[in-house]
Amino acid sequence: MRKLLALSLLFVFALSCGSKSGSKRSKGELVGVQGKKYYPEKPFGMGLVPGGSFIMGKSDDDLPALDDAPTKTVTVRSYYMDETEITNAEYRQFVYWVRDSVIRTALADRAEDVLGGEPTDGNVDGIGEYAYIDADTSDLGVYDKYMKDVYDRRKLNWDTDLIFDRSEYPDEDYLEVMESFFIPEDEVFNDIRTWDVTNFKFAYLDSRVQEYLDEKQILIDALANDEIAPIYNPTDKQLEEEFPGFKRSNFITRETLEVYPDTTVWITDFKYSYNEPMHNDYFWHDAYSSYPVVGVTWKQANAFCQWRTNTKNAYQRTKKKKSLVPEFRLPTEAEWEYAARGGLQSAMYPWGGPYTKNDRGCFMANFKPMRGDYAVDQALYTVEANAYDPNGYNLYNMAGNVSEWVDSSYEQDAYEYSASMNPNVNNIYNEKKIIRGGSWKDVKYFLQVSSRDYEYQDQPRSYIGFRTVHDYLGADLTANAMTNTTIRKRKNQRSSIK
């Protein structure tokens, strides 16, 4: 009886606490809205680069290059960076996701045609198993039904596995859909019928706030002087003569592009040279899974970043106590150089010293050391993404192997007018994008952490890859201190070895 009475009193007490208004719970004080506790998580395969200041630009006696990269003290925020360049295996995950989503969309459309758009109870065979999961609207919530009816937003069925074995295709409709994604029979070579990779297209949204704010200011200044000021609309690819009002959509561009790497770069980059084996096998063969992906454009690299962000946040939404993560993106030019230096000031290379060989006579990066000699260390083309020793931030191949796309546009005088805090110059009209780090086909000058080079954003190359960064939210001084301590330990270890 006493236990029952105690439980009853506890229940009444709980109800009385829950019925209090917000002002009573806060006792009239400003306590803020209570949210979930945020704990930063290091993404898999990334390392923390603690923010700080450094002298950016040429620090040696390369006088001609001072016009291109004069010294300037800048500060960058903390961020995570991929320890290696994005590998073929990692990029294949992106390509396979795009392939599967495109195929599932085509199967769902065919299923809707076959079933006549009639609701299903789930007891369907063949292509009906791949119908949109909202085809049966009886179980849809109000929001999902509204989005389907008003915006035609459909959900694919990812629970049913795709069948790639031709002998196991469930029905003729499935067969016809799958056959549409392979190259035509008259283009088959060596009896191998491969995917028509031009079908694998990824659509994504990109926001360029700074560029549009600059355009808005140009318009405001021009209109104040009664001038006509055209603005470029990247979505419609045309100039608008009227003031557009700058809605939210003006800050968003919609891109759709093919994601499969251009494997022909191994042949087109080098005339009168036999590189067909690399063209045939480099991207898809397991032997090269851990090698850096090449043949991707600057826009394809950005599309990969968008997909990686979406994939991570899709998982985060399935967990109640998980917060959404900031975007994955290409590093700015300043972030790349800061990370490449590995905590060393005024160093020529990521490993510090002015030499490209260690004390045992071994090269410390994959590059072209002598005229006509690409393979003095048996590395003719690229090597594994984690080959050679990492720098002070545990980042591999920040010099050599493949050059890397960064977010910044190439402007010769960018260092003169860019900000000193998180500097970045990315002009939407300038298709020249910075590449950094040098590659397997470059001489050692391009391996220097301050050397700048560029390529057009739509031009894939057999010597250009990329790695991504991920913003660190907050200012965890403990984490930064621990990282700096680790860097000092590595420096001391290297000093003792020497």
Q: Over which residues does each language-model region extend?
A:
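Short capping motifs at secondary-structure boundaries
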Residues: Y79, I86, V95-R104, R308-T318, ...
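Non-catalytic, alpha-helical, charged scaffold/linker segments
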Residues: D109-E242
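Post-signal peptide N-terminal segment of mature Sec-exported envelope proteins
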Residues: K24-G51
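Functional-site microenvironments in short loops/helix caps that host divalent-cation chemistry
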Residues: S21-K27, L48-V49, I55, D60, ...
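Short proline/glycine-enriched turn/loop segments at secondary-structure junctions
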Residues: N424-N427, D453-P460
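C-terminal motif of bacterial Sec signal peptides marking the signal peptidase cleavage site
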Residues: L15-S16
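Sec-dependent N-terminal signal peptides
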Residues: L5-V12
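Short, structured beta-strand segments at or near domain termini in extracellular proteins/domains
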Residues: S462-L477
